[in-house]
Amino acid sequence: MYYFEILEGLYKSKVRYFIAGGLSVNLYGVPRVTQDIDIVIAMDRENVLKITSLLKELGYVPRLPVSPDDLANPDKVKDWIENKNLKAFSFYHKNENYKVIDIVLVHSLDFEKSFKNRTVKRAKDIDIYLASIDDVVKMKEFSGRTQDLSDIEMLNKVRKYLEEKNG
């Protein structure tokens, strides 16, 4: 599973991120097919360059015909969002193009607050950061796609189960 290679790299590189898409739904225990990793990152220059460096090292390239380091330029990111309707900056593996990492640019969360409230899962000696169930639900409500509405229903069931289990 290519996910682990990415998650291990994020952990070792000390990237400030959390998983917020279908993979987070899976990691909360909801079976669901997903092909990519949707992450939200702190958009400060240092953090962005950590992740772009990691992705380049692992063989990932941007789907857009731009330098990956352009993601560290707030003016370019603003232009992509406002003038090109870009919602996520996608990277794919140059030899295995089904391996996709989407850095979500447009969402309804305050990164610092959400990072503080993240859920930490431990696997093979690394910490994996997930958006809290509440934050995943907020993001999915913001998107409003059919699959997102189904995910919200299932996440609410997981939340209820966890609340009952933990008292």
Question: Model regions: which residues?
Answer:
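Compositionally biased terminal segments of proteins
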Residues: 1-167
